[in-house]
């Protein structure tokens, strides 16, 4: 898959995820105790055989840069890389990124590789597992200029999505951002559930196709769309316009997918991972989630009751502690007889002595 270049968008200010984003960007926020959110799209790329990856960053990016530098190091011979493109002022432009599309436009000089046929545009703040080779297969079989990943959703959920309308071949004909009424859905973007069922996915009452924010562009198509316009955002501007001018196809996806854009969604997604029947399985040998190896000691437990929880490395948990339905991050020290439930402990970057904690 050396002809595919992946571009991961590092996200904006992350105001809806504040205070978790007070000192770090959204993709750098910890996930499931030991990972960072950015590990998800990067792992998806690597598991799909796509190892040429650029990460576009701007806000609070020091922690994210450090994580990428320490984690993703490839040998010199396979041509793979995960490289950071930080926002910068240049002779051509003195403004910062104004949106997702503008971020890619400002980096086209770095992205214009002659050996690249496709650009895969990804968000850096989503939790899901996808084989992008299937997306590429849909793109090539349909002769698409642009292919977008689409997830079937209910009408209630559609109010939080950009919803697309497709014809029988899967070509996208219309798009509506966050429809608020059944009338809007019926008249503009409803998808026949039978069409979804016919493609091997059970519709289960879902008659809307939501935009997942995952786009595959032909190389020249993306460059042309960005250079001949001043569009700032992929979802709100580039994608709707490309529907009118190019062959845009939908690629159906029916796995677990969560946009971790708010404190509530972050909390709920983490706690879902602690369940025995978690909808997203971290323990997947065929498609593992990669992250930084910290070489911490095993967690020490002493007469502890643990139920439906994730405990990271390097923790010390005192006798009689009870931990239920919770995530415990790296290097946490939990005292005797402490009870923790339905909680997320973010962990620590270093150990503190008893004297330091008392100060």
Question: Where do the language-model regions lie?
Answer:
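A secondary-structure boundary/capping signal
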Residues: 9, 122-123, 218, 253
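Conserved core of the sugar-phosphate nucleotidyltransferase
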Residues: 129-216, 229
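Left-handed beta-helix
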Residues: 1-5, 194-205, 219-359
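Active-site glycine-centered loops adjacent to acidic/histidine catalytic or metal-binding residues
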Residues: 12, 125, 262
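Conserved N-terminal catalytic core of the sugar/cofactor nucleotidyltransferase
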Residues: 1-8, 16-22, 30-138, 166-167
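Proline-centered turn/helix-capping motifs that create local helix->coil transitions or kinks
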Residues: 72-80, 168-174, 181-186, 275-282
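A structural signal for short hydrophobic beta-strand segments in well-ordered beta-sheet cores
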Residues: 28, 163-166, 250
């Amino acid at each position: 898959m050396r002809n595919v270049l992946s571009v991961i968008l590092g996200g904006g200010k992350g105001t809806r995820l504040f205070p978790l984003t007070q000192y770090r960007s959204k993709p750098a926020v910890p996930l499931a105790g030991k990972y960072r959110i950015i590990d998800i799209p990067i792992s998806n790329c690597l598991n799909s055989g796509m190892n040429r990856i650029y990460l576009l960053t701007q806000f609070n990016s020091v922690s994210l840069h450090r994580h990428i530098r320490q984690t993703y190091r490839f040998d010199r011979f396979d041509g793979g890389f995960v490289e950071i493109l930080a926002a910068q002022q240049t002779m051509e432009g003195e403004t910062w990124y104004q949106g997702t599309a503008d971020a890619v436009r400002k980096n086209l000089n770095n992205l214009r590789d002659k050996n690249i046929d496709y650009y895969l545009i990804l968000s850096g703040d989503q939790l899901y597992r996808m084989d992008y080779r299937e997306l590429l297969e849909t793109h090539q079989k349909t002769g698409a200029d642009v292919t977008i990943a689409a997830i079937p959703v209910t009408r209630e959920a559609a109010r939080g999505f950009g919803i697309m309308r497709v014809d029988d071949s899967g070509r996208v004909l219309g798009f509506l951002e966050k429809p608020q009424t059944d009338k809007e859905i019926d008249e503009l973007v409803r998808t026949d559930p039978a069409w979804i069922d016919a493609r091997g996915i059970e519709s289960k009452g879902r008659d809307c196709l939501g935009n997942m924010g995952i786009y595959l562009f032909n190389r020249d198509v993306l460059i042309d769309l960005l250079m001949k316009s001043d569009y700032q955002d992929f979802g709100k501007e580039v994608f709707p316009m490309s529907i009118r001018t190019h062959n845009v196809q939908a690629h159906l996806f029916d796995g677990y997918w969560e946009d971790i854009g708010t404190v509530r969604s972050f909390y709920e997604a983490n706690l879902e991972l602690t369940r025995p029947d978690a909808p997203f399985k971290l323990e997947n040998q065929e498609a593992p989630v990669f992250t930084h190896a910290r070489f911490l000691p095993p967690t020490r437990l002493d007469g502890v009751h643990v139920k439906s929880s994730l405990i990271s490395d390097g923790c010390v948990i005192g006798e009689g502690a009870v931990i239920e339905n919770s995530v415990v991050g790296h290097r946490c020290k939990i005292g005797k007889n402490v009870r923790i439930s339905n909680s997320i402990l973010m962990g620590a970057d270093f150990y503190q002595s008893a004297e330091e904690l008392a100060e």
